[in-house]
């Protein structure tokens, strides 16, 4: 199931006769390579004119966004109360009005690990924002339950990979500890996209029979917290 959201911003001219509507349609789909969703968005601009009590609307521009960095930037500057959900058919209608685009980056700009999958050549390969990338790399290799699989007695019946809550907390802390003005911009994009826009929730593991001398939890039982973000809630709805 896909998530479709429309974020609407209206900018009125001084005489309120002509206005510009900027609409962002967002589609999140499951990734087979990581816990991150594959994000796709369409930003469209319409001019709206009101004359003699009648309104007319004309498309002025269209852009398909596949970069998490661009999508996060658009979502961050859009008031949350203007977020609306539309149907998949409506999304396909607007996509059909845009020109096809080639493959776009699916990681946050300046990183190789922060996104659906990764662009790294090897484990040591990091992007420009290497400190942010280290956080994402560790998160990618942390304890998880892939979609459809069972671990700790918990079956992941959702669409996305489910992460251990300890991994989510460590990821959030790792990002929060990063300083630097420009780096913080990348941190904001990563945190907003993953925790707020997506928000798949996580699972806690209880060691009912205690831990082993090596601190392992061989008979652990996991409990899912439930989705925390609008993206995961809509996509997993009805599963």
Swiss-Prot record:
Residues 1-19 form the signal peptide. PROSITE patterns: PA2_HIS. GO terms for molecular function: calcium channel regulator activity; metal ion binding; phospholipase A2 activity; toxin activity. GO terms for biological process: arachidonate secretion; lipid catabolic process; phospholipid metabolic process. Keywords: Calcium, Calcium channel impairing toxin, Disulfide bond, Hydrolase, Ion channel impairing toxin, Lipid degradation, Lipid metabolism, Metal-binding, Neurotoxin, Ryanodine-sensitive calcium-release channel impairing toxin, Secreted, Signal, Toxin, Zymogen. It catalyses: a 1,2-diacyl-sn-glycero-3-phosphocholine + H2O = a 1-acyl-sn-glycero-3-phosphocholine + a fatty acid + H(+). Disulfide bonds join 114-136, 135-174, 142-167, 165-202, 207-217. Its EC number is 3.1.1.4. Residues 20-105, 211-213 form a propeptide. It is an enzyme of class 3 (hydrolase). Ca(2+) binds at residues 113, 115, 117, 140. Its cofactor is Ca(2+). InterPro entries: PLipase_A2_dom (IPR016090), PLipase_A2_dom_sf (IPR036444), PLipase_A2_His_AS (IPR033113). GO terms for cellular component: extracellular region. Binds 1 Ca(2+) ion. It comes from the Eukaryota. Expressed by the venom gland. The active site is at residue 139. It is found in: Secreted. Its main location: secreted. Toxic phospholipase A2, which may catalyze the calcium-dependent hydrolysis of the 2-acyl groups in 3-sn-phosphoglycerides. Inhibits both skeletal (RYR1) and cardiac (RYR2) ryanodine receptors (calcium release channels). Probably blocks ryanodine receptors by generating a lipid product. Belongs to the phospholipase A2 family. Group III subfamily. Heterodimer composed of a small subunit and a large subunit; disulfid-linked. This is Phospholipase A2. It comes from Hoffmannihadrurus gertschi.
């Amino acid at each position: 199931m896909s998530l479709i959201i429309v974020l609407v911003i209206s900018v009125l001219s001084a005489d309120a006769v002509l206005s510009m509507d900027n609409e962002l349609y967002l589609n999140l789909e499951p990734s087979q390579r990581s816990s991150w969703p594959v994000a796709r968005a369409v930003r469209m601009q319409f001019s709206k004119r009101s004359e003699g009590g009648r309104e007319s609307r004309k498309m002025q521009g269209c852009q398909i966004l596949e970069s998490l960095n661009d999508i996060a930037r658009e979502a961050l500057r859009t008031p949350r109360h203007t977020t609306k959900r539309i149907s998949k058919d409506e999304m396909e209608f607007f996509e059909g009005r845009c020109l096809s685009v080639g493959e776009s980056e699916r990681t946050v700009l300046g990183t190789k690990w922060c996104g659906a999958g990764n662009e790294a050549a090897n484990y040591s390969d990091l992007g420009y924002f290497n400190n942010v990338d280290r956080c994402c790399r560790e998160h990618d290799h942390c304890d998880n339950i892939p979609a459809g699989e069972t671990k700790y007695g918990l079956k992941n019946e959702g669409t996305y990979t489910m992460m251990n809550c300890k991994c989510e907390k460590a990821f959030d802390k790792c990002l929060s500890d990063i300083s630097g003005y420009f780096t913080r911009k990348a941190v904001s994009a990563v945190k907003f996209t993953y925790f707020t826009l997506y928000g798949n929730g996580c699972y806690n593991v209880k060691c009912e029979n205690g831990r082993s001398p090596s601190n392992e939890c061989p008979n652990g039982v996991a409990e899912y917290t439930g989705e925390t973000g609008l993206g995961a809630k809509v996509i997993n709805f009805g599963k």
